[in-house]
C-alpha cells in the first residue's frame, strides 16, 4: 500500500509489510513560495513575471525512514533548513540567487537531504 501524508500507525504498517511507501514532507513548499514572495517585497525579485516553483515530496520507504521523518521532519522543534540555508534563499544575503537556483535548492529536498542535515 502507498499513502499520501502520514498517519498514526505508520510504524506498524511498515513492520507488518502493509505499507510500501508514504509520501510526506510538504512544508518546504510553503517556505520556498514565501521566499519568492519575500525576495519580491524586499526589492530583490527573482522574476518580473509570476513564478512557478515545483516541490518534490519525501518518499518514505521503510520503518527506519519513517522514524527519521517523525523525529526530524515532522517535529516542529527541528528545522531541516537552518538559518544559513534560509539566508541563501534571500537575495539580500545571496547576491547570486536566481529563480533557477531557488528551484534547484527546492529540488534537493529528499530523504538523502534530510539525512545530510541531521548529521551536521
What label would you give each PLM region?
Residues 11, 31-34, 38:
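Extracytoplasmic/secreted envelope proteins and their assembly/folding machinery
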Residues 13, 31, 70-72:
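Generic alpha-helix signal with a bias toward terminal, lower-confidence helices
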Residues 1-18, 28:
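Venus flytrap/periplasmic-binding-protein-like
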Residues 36-120:
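Hinge/cleft segment of the Venus flytrap/periplasmic-binding protein
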Residues 24-25:
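Short, glycine-/small-residue-rich phosphate/pyrophosphate-handling segment
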Amino acid at each position: 500500500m502507498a499513502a499520501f501524508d502520514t498517519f498514526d500507525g505508520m510504524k506498524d504498517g511498515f513492520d507488518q509489510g502493509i505499507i510500501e511507501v508514504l509520501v510526506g514532507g510538504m512544508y518546504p513548499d510553503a517556505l520556498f513560495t514565501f521566499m519568492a514572495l519575500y525576495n519580491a517585497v524586499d526589492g530583490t525579485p527573482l522574476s518580473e513575471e509570476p513564478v512557478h516553483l515545483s516541490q518534490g515530496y519525501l518518499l518514505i520507504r521503510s520503518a527506519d525512514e519513517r522514524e527519521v521523518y517523525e523525529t526530524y521532519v515532522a517535529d516542529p522543534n527541528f528545522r531541516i533548513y537552518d538559518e544559513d540555508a534560509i539566508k541563501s534563499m534571500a537575495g539580500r544575503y545571496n547576491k547570486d540567487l536566481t529563480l533557477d537556483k531557488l528551484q534547484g535548492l527546492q529540488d534537493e529536498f529528499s530523504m538523502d537531504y534530510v539525512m545530510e542535515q541531521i548529521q551536521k
